[in-house]
Amino acid sequence: MRRRKAPVREIMPDPVYGSKVLTKFINKIMFDGKKSTAEKIIYSAMDIISSRGEKTGIDTFNEAIENIKPIIEVKSRRVGGATYQVPVEVRPVRQLSLAIRWLVDASRKRNERTMAERLANELMDASSDKGNAFKKKEDTYRMAEANKAFAHYRW
């Protein structure tokens, strides 16, 4: 473990929408340091969402992130030779990073032709409480509910 808490790096808002969350999302989508390609994918996904729905792309994005943020998760804890899945609350920074990770993973697993289409469809699904990313959150909640009896092992 580290001696001190890691300093939180300042993140610049993205140039089009001025959102720090979207910048984090762009960085998560990025492969091999190709940020301009990642930006192109995300902004074209936003255009697809805006052309399809009644909401703007950024509104749908923010709603999807809020719907996917987990409030509770399970962590493994060894007690006397047995490993228990202990439900714990999730800190806000981790909520955001989990939501972003789940959205990116779910959109990469979809079957549409381009990544922008996959991302747009996953964001629209997540904003309406559907899709694989939302299913991942529900599974996490189900695990926490099933292991509620071990909540007193929290640390």
Curated annotation (Swiss-Prot):
Please list which residues make up the signal peptide: none
Instruction: Classify the source by domain of life.
Output: Bacteria
What InterPro entries does its record include? Ribosomal_uS7, Ribosomal_uS7_bac/org-type, Ribosomal_uS7_CS, Ribosomal_uS7_dom, Ribosomal_uS7_dom_sf
One GO process term, biological-process aspect: translation
Q: Which cellular components does GO assign to this protein?
A: small ribosomal subunit
Example of a GO MF term: rRNA binding
Assembly:
Part of the 30S ribosomal subunit. Contacts proteins S9 and S11.
What is the protein's known function? One of the primary rRNA binding proteins, it binds directly to 16S rRNA where it nucleates assembly of the head domain of the 30S subunit. Is located at the subunit interface close to the decoding center, probably blocks exit of the E-site tRNA.
Q: Which family does it belong to?
A: Belongs to the universal ribosomal protein uS7 family.
Name of the protein this chain belongs to: Small ribosomal subunit protein uS7
Gene from which this protein is expressed: rpsG
